[in-house]
């Protein structure tokens, strides 16, 4: 395997790859602003206020914020009993006061390639969006250009690595999903109705979509682990979803296969469809952990890195008609 170049000096220090990533994350999560460091190739000085990037390399990482006109909780941790680092990377990228970009990347290829691929993809996407923001580029165009740039950046690593990448953009009340690989996105209503569900780019994912398997059968299928589309390859393809209008109290979920391969979709929906977002994340994380450790043959059990984002848009403020008495007082 070819050795990748070391990152450029960050803030005057010459850092190894792992130290450079940790310094990036320290900057990302400090003082309400983020300094986005490109991986091999240089340092980007663009600032995105409120940016969250979760690494969770060796211990669980959880972040919550009010962003994009709603509330978000993001979580990532490595697989149980795993000696190597978590290969997932998660990001929440603000795009103005009422818009946000949610990102889950699940690196493939093993240490250090998997983590490097997912972090490179996320860093490249953040860099592209920060530039597009300053140039007032349309978000859909910025996302597609950013994904293409991320694909080229991972290919340039030349170490055989690749990563999934699932993105959901929320602009006002409009949500749209972009998918490469088997990390998934779901939008559900407060009563549990599925309003959007992406298709995993895998043999079992396509079989479920075509009706040859149901979702419970797919969780136990021998080829569940196979993935047919990755970022970092010459034949990478982007699955672009149709825009949907978010309704009050709709919940948006992005998750790596660490969640989707261990918890049935109806169980996930029951936990996330209502109630505080942080409680929803805690509940599905605990259930996924339990399944990963059980392996009783009855329930799905696939130890893996676990990452998810739960976002819920704030309900629109109700407008009071002119002359209508306010609660507790008469109209003037």
Q: Where do the protein language model's features map onto the residues?
A:
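PP2C/PPM-type serine/threonine phosphatase catalytic domain
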Residues: 1-332
